[in-house]
Amino acid sequence: MTSIRTSNCASEGRRLTILYMTQTGTSSDLALRISRQAQRKRFHVTIADVCSYDPTDLVSESLMLFLVSTTGQGEFPTTSRPFWNFLLRKGIPEDILEDVTFAAFGLGDSTYPRFCWPVRLLSRRLRGLGAKELVEHGEGDDMHYLGLEGELGPWMNRFWRKLDELCPLEAGVREVGRDELLPPSVTVTKVETEEGRLKEKHDGRDALGRHLEDQGWSISILDKNQRMTATDHFQDVRLLEFVRLNQTDVEEDKRQIGENEEISRGSASALDGISIQTYRPGDILCLHPINDAASVTEMLSRLDLDADTLVSLAGSTIPSTVPQSPAHMSVRDLLTHHLDFTSVPTNSFFEQIRLFSPTGSQEREKLDEYCGIFPEEELAKGANPQDGIDEMYEYAQRPRRTIKEVLDEFKSVQVPLAYIADVLPWIKPREFSIASAPPANSEREKRVSEEPHAIQLSVAMVKYKTRLRKARTGLCTRWLSSLPLGSRVPVVIKPGYLTLPPAQAPLILIGPGTGCAPLRSLVIDRLSNSTLARSEIHLFLGFRYRTKDYLFQHDWQHLQQSYANQFHLHTAFSRDGEAKTYVQDLIVKPDNAHVLWEAITERNAWIVVAGASGKMPEQVRGAFESIARSQGGMDEEQAKRFMDALERQRRWQEECWG
C-alpha cells in the first residue's frame, strides 16, 4: 500500500473544478468521491460549494463538473440560488464562457414531476453562455433499486472516457493505481500540548453547542417531548417543543464563558435565544443529533483508537458544523459529535476500506468484488464487474447494514486515525417542518414577543426491523429519545420551500400523517391573523385510526368550532372501516369536488400537499386531474396541462420528504 502526495498525483495543466449544490450533503459526498477518482487520473482538483464560489471566476475556468441536488418542486438548493440568479442576469455576453468545458450530474427523485430540473436548467444556461458540454448531463434517481448509483456508474464511465480523450496523459505518465493510497482529503493532526488538554477539559461540557453558535445556531431548551400516538400504535410520533433560554440561563452562560473571552457569533446568537422574527409558516428547524456514549465506546474499541487523543482537523470539504484547526477535540468527541457510523454504507465507503484490508486476504478479495474489481483472469472468464456491485447492494444497502456492522464483519480492515474522517461520513443536521405558527397579528419582520415562544415539531421516531430481522433505530431517534426535558439543544431555522399564498387566496391543504405539521403552522397563522383570515381553508388529513394516530386532533376540532365559516376539515382514516379511505378519495367526492373546483377556478385557490414522497403526491395530483375532468369537462391531456399551469403559477406546491 503506497501513499502518494497530492502534488505528485497531478500532471501540469490537468485541472478540474468540481462545484456542488447541496441541501443535505449528498452531492458534497459525491464531489469527494469523484475528486479521488480524478486525482488518480493526475488532475489538480478543486472542490467548492457554489455558495462559497465567486461566479465571476467562471471565466477563468477551463474544465468543470457540476453536481446538482434537487429540492422542493424541482428547485435549486437554497444556498445555490444566488449562484443561479447570477447566471440569469441580463446582459451577460452569450460567448463569455466559450473557453469552459463542463459536465453536470443531477441528483433527484423521479416520483416528483420536476425530476432533476435544476441540472437541466443549469446545463442549458451554461451552453447558452458559450460553454461546451463534455457529455450529456446525467440524472441520478433515488428511486432506482441501486439509488443514485444506478445512473451514476454508467454516466461516470462516459464522463471519464470523454475526459481521457480531451486531456490525454503525457507520454510516460501513468494513472495512480487503484491499490495505491491517496492522501486524505481531511488532515487529522494530533495535538500533544498540555495546554491543549487543559483547554479540551474546560470546553468539553458543550463544545459542539458553542461551535454551532459561532455558525449562527441558537441554544434552545427542550420543553416537551410527548408521544402523540397511542402506546399500542406501531409508530411513535413525538411532539417536541423548544423554547429560548430565559434571562437567568443567559447570565449563567455569560458567567461560564467568561467576561474576557472573546467569542465570535453568527447571525443568530445563542445568548439571544431562538430568533422568532426569522421564521414563517413552512420554514424548517434543524437539529444536530449525536451518537450515544455506549456506541462510541464500541466504535473506539473496534478502530483501536485512544479516546483521549486530541486532534485538530483541516480541509476544504469539512462541513461548517465541524470545528477546524486551531480548534481541537478528543477522538471521543470527534466520534460522538461529528462522525456517523450508524448510517448505511455507500459505494464510496467500500472503495475506501478495501485499501485498509491486507492484499491477498479473503476479506480484501470480497471488498474488491463489492467495488467491481476482479482479477484479469476472472474477467477473461466472463466475470461482470456490475455483478460485484449488485452483490454489495444485496449485502449492505438492501438489508440496511450499518457502517459499524460492516466493520465488525470485516475484521481485517484497520482504518488509521489519519483517514478516519475520510472513511466515515459526517453527521448531517436533520430538517423538520415547524408545526407551530409564529406570533400572529403582525407582519413577519415585526414579530417580536416578550414571552418565550415555543417552536413545535411533530417527529416520527425511526424504528424498524431490517431484512435480517435486526431492530434498527435511527441516529436522530436514539438521540431524541435519550434527551431529558430541560436539555439544551442547538437549533437553527432555515427558510422553507413554500411560497406563501396571498391573503385573499383560498387554501386547499392536503397533509396525510406528519404532513399535517407545516399545514398546522400555515392554518393557525392564517386564522389567528385578522389581516389574513379572509378566505376559506379546506384541510384534508389522512391517518390510520381516529383513536391512535390522529395528530393534533384537539387543535383541528377547536379550529373547526371557532372558525366554522372559514375552516373546513376533512379526515380520512384508512384502517377504521372495512373499506380503506384515503385523502384522495375525499377530494373526488362529488360534493367536495364541486366546491374545490369553484375555489380553484373562480377564487384562485392555492393547493399545498405535504407529507411523505412517493405515491401519495402523485395520487393526490391525480385526484385533482379527476376533478378537472368531472367538473371542468376536460379530457385527460387538458387536465394534466391545467395542473401544470397551476404548478407554474405556484398555486400547486408540494412539501414532501423521503
Curated annotation (Swiss-Prot):
Question: Gene3D superfamilies given for it?
Answer: 3.40.50.360, NADPH-cytochrome p450 Reductase, Chain A, domain 3, Nucleotide-binding domain of ferredoxin-NADP reductase (FNR) module, Translation factors
Primary localization class, coarse? cytoplasm
UniProt-listed InterPro entries? CysJ-like_FAD-binding (IPR003097), FAD-bd_FR_type (IPR017927), Flavdoxin-like (IPR001094), Flavodoxin/NO_synth (IPR008254), Flavoprot_Pyr_Nucl_cyt_Rdtase (IPR001709), Flavoprotein-like_sf (IPR029039), FNR_nucleotide-bd (IPR039261), NADPH_Cyt_P450_Rdtase_alpha (IPR023173)
Q: Which reaction does it catalyse?
A: 2 oxidized [2Fe-2S]-[protein] + NADPH = 2 reduced [2Fe-2S]-[protein] + NADP(+) + H(+)
Which processes are annotated in GO (biological process)? iron-sulfur cluster assembly
Into which EC class is this enzyme placed? Answer: oxidoreductase
Question: For FMN, which residues are the binding ones?
Answer: 22-27, 69-72, 107-116, 142
EC numbers listed for it are 1.18.1.-
Q: Which PROSITE patterns match?
A: FAD_FR (PS51384), FLAVODOXIN_LIKE (PS50902)
Keyword list (alphabetical) reads:
Cytoplasm, FAD, Flavoprotein, FMN, Mitochondrion, NADP, Oxidoreductase
Q: Which domain of life is it from?
A: Eukaryota
What positions does the domain FAD-binding FR-type occupy? 215-502
Any one GO cellular component localisation term in the record: cytosol
Q: Which cofactor does it need?
A: FAD; FMN
User: What positions does the domain Flavodoxin-like occupy?
Assistant: 16-160
Q: Which family does it belong to?
A: Belongs to the NADPH-dependent diflavin oxidoreductase NDOR1 family.
Q: What is this protein's function?
A: NADPH-dependent reductase which is a central component of the cytosolic iron-sulfur (Fe-S) protein assembly (CIA) machinery. Transfers electrons from NADPH via its FAD and FMN prosthetic groups to the [2Fe-2S] cluster of DRE2, another key component of the CIA machinery. In turn, this reduced cluster provides electrons for assembly of cytosolic iron-sulfur cluster proteins. Positively controls H(2)O(2)-induced cell death.
Q: How does it assemble?
A: Interacts with DRE2; as part of the cytosolic iron-sulfur (Fe-S) protein assembly (CIA) machinery.
Which HAMAP family does the record cross-reference, listed alphabetically? NDOR1
Can you name this protein? NADPH-dependent diflavin oxidoreductase 1
